Amino acid sequence: MRRFLTVQFALLALLVLAVPANASTLGQRVLEKGDRGDDVVTLQRILGMKGYSVGGADGVFGRRTKVAVKRFQRRRHLKADGRVGPATTRALARTWGVRTATYYGPGLYGNRTACGFTLRHRTRGVAHRSLPCGTRVPVYRNGLIAIFPVIDRGPHTSGVQLDLTHAAARKLGMRTTSAVRAGY
């Protein structure tokens, strides 16, 4: 019986260690080699957009991701330690244009978007006047970066360049019309 419990405990520990940490928004934690999760996927996609090869966005911060991060850090005159903290996260978005963004959603849930999606409470995406439907748009605000697909047309307010769904705005901590950096 004791051996059986020891084996069960070992299997449980293995499962717990194998489950990736799932901080889904880049900037919620410091990333380093060995980390896993959706935030690592976001990092890998952004590095790829900037021309740094990571071998694909698999969500595992491995050797190739660390090498790409260090190259990026050196080119931006940051401490090249291969870790992604607030300074590196800011630097990733620094070259993106500053845009005025607002959000939409409440009162429109259940309606179809211009790109064929049904808008729901948890739908994360952006509305843009001309980017093709499905284009991934990285957005930076409050030290956080997330990538959202274009799912609708808009915004329909003068002086606003980007419209986030309510769920996308919440993910970035946005509560009012705000300045964001967007990589398009």
Regions inferred by a protein language model and the residue ranges of each:
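Secreted/periplasmic proteins
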Residues: 39, 90-184
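Secretory targeting and sorting signals
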Residues: 1-23
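Short acidic, glycine/serine/threonine-rich helix-capping segments at coil-helix boundaries
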Residues: 30-90
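Generic anion/oxyanion-binding catalytic loop in active/binding sites
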Residues: 12, 29-32, 78, 123, ...
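Alpha-helix boundary/capping residues
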Residues: 11, 47, 72, 76, ...
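Residues at the start of alpha-helices and the adjacent loop-to-helix junctions
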Residues: 5, 15, 36, 160-161
